[in-house]
Structures are given as C-alpha cells and as structure tokens.
C-alpha cells in the first residue's frame, strides 16, 4: 500500500468552526454518527505543494478539449495538489488523491447514498458541508438503472463553505463525452468512472461558471482520484451554452482577479481536506451501510 505521511489539518475559519458544532449536534442520533469525525488528516506533501504559492502557468491546464484530454494520456501523472490564476480570469485547481482500500464501487455508492440526508453529506467535510440534495432523487435511487444513468443529467444542489465564503452551487453531472473527454482515450485509459460536472451559482443555474473533472481509477491497493477545477471565464468554455455570461456574473458577485485567485487557493485546500477525509472512512462506511445494488 502507498506509504504517505499524513498530518492533521487544524485551521478552519470561524464560520466553519460554528458549522461543525451545528453539524455535530444534528448527526448525533444517526446510525452512522461514529463516522462524523473532528480530526482531518491530509498528506504533508500536498500541503507543502500548496504552500509554494500559485503554480507557473506553463504547468497548468486550461479547460480546452485538448488540455482536458491530456488527463487521459498514458504517460500523464497528475501533481498531488496545486492552484493558479489563469488568464480570463479563471481559478484553477489540480489534485490527485489516493483512497487506500477503496474500490470504484464504493466511490460510486457514496454519490448515490450521501445526497439522501444532509447529515450524510456532513461526514465528508464536517466543517464545511451544509447540504447537497439531488434534484431527481427518485432517479438517483432507482436500482434498475446503472450508476451513469442515475447520475448523469442529474443535479446536486450543494451548500458548503469554501474558506469563509458560504457558496450555493448547482452541480450538473455530465457524460464525460459531453464535457469534451474523448471516448476512445477514456476507454484506453481504463478509467473506472467519472463524476465530472458543470457548476453554476444556485441563483443563476443557466450560466455555467465552472468545469469540474473527477476521474477515478482502481489500483492494486485502492483507488486514485484525479481532479481539476476551473472557475471563471475562458474562451474554451464557449462550448457550453450560457458560459459566455460567466465573466460578468462572477464580477457582479464580487469575483475579480484577486478574489478568484483566493478562491483557487481555498478550493485547493477544500479539495485536499474533503477527499482525503472521505478516503479515511469510506471503506468502513460502505461495509456497514453499502449494498451491491446501490
């Protein structure tokens, strides 16, 4: 199994500290309450990469079709963490997380199971997550459908803190090909699944302001999740209807260049915390509450 030096992550903004206490009280009588844990551990190597400051632009990817398909190239290995401000302006975040003892089935199950109750969502990031209901919840729970049929074309309505900013987002999960990933390359890369999406601000769901790519793949000792986030304006986002309005909408909501760079940093920290925390308990949670059909 991959050897990693994990370290406690201990700084959370005051609003997040207060949210933790509310979440702790809400989950107390749930059968899965023991998985609500205050300690969050992250790879020290990922922390150190983020501490180096914004990445050089030549080391980043844009949301263009050409660049996102680089994630599928046989010799491509993602960096563990990092963030930058791209021209546009656009916030950029990259990461690669290891889930020891986890399978693709466990990870898929999590995306079916957690939206049913807000308290389940809080297990994922107790200091940051509020709720994440699914628009088409009956389809999400329909065991006669495949995972892809249940998730793609479905929308999660996430409320969560990113840093000290409470964000209300619509996450519209899409087929990989709909986002620009090449079907042949995807198959050749032997990706076990994708939970990739377009994101919008909840009060403007018709304007995608973000492309989020999450690709997961099993390895002998667990699973790797490779992720990219792009938030903001970029010419290549024009392939998504409504994205041409993203720049003005974000500016109206207080996201200038400085704010987007801060958001990139905070998203990098958020991603590092939530997915490494999920990795710490998902196999045990699945063994207790998961079913093969889900």
UniProtKB/Swiss-Prot annotation:
Enzyme's top EC category: hydrolase
Ranges in coiled-coil conformation: none
Effect listed in the UniProt record for changing residue 160 to A: Almost loss of activity
Result for mutant: residue 229 to F: 3-fold decrease in catalytic efficiency
Pfam families attached to this UniProt entry: DAPG_hydrolase
Effect of residue 214 to A: 4-fold decrease in catalytic efficiency
Effect of residue 274 to A: Almost loss of activity
Enzyme Commission code: 3.7.1.24
Residues annotated to bind Zn(2+): 129, 160, 270, 274
Keywords: Hydrolase, Metal-binding, Zinc
Catalytic activity: 2,4-diacetylphloroglucinol + H2O = 2-acetylphloroglucinol + acetate
Cofactors (names): Zn(2+)
Subunit structure: Homodimer.
Domain notes: Contains a small N-terminal domain involved in dimerization and a large C-terminal Bet v1-like fold catalytic domain.
Stated role: Hydrolase that specifically degrades the potent antimicrobial compound 2,4-diacetylphloroglucinol (DAPG) to equimolar amounts of mildly toxic monoacetylphloroglucinol (MAPG) and acetate.
The protein's name in its UniProt record: 2,4-diacetylphloroglucinol hydrolase
Organism lineage string: Bacteria, Pseudomonadati, Pseudomonadota, Gammaproteobacteria, Pseudomonadales
Gene: phlG
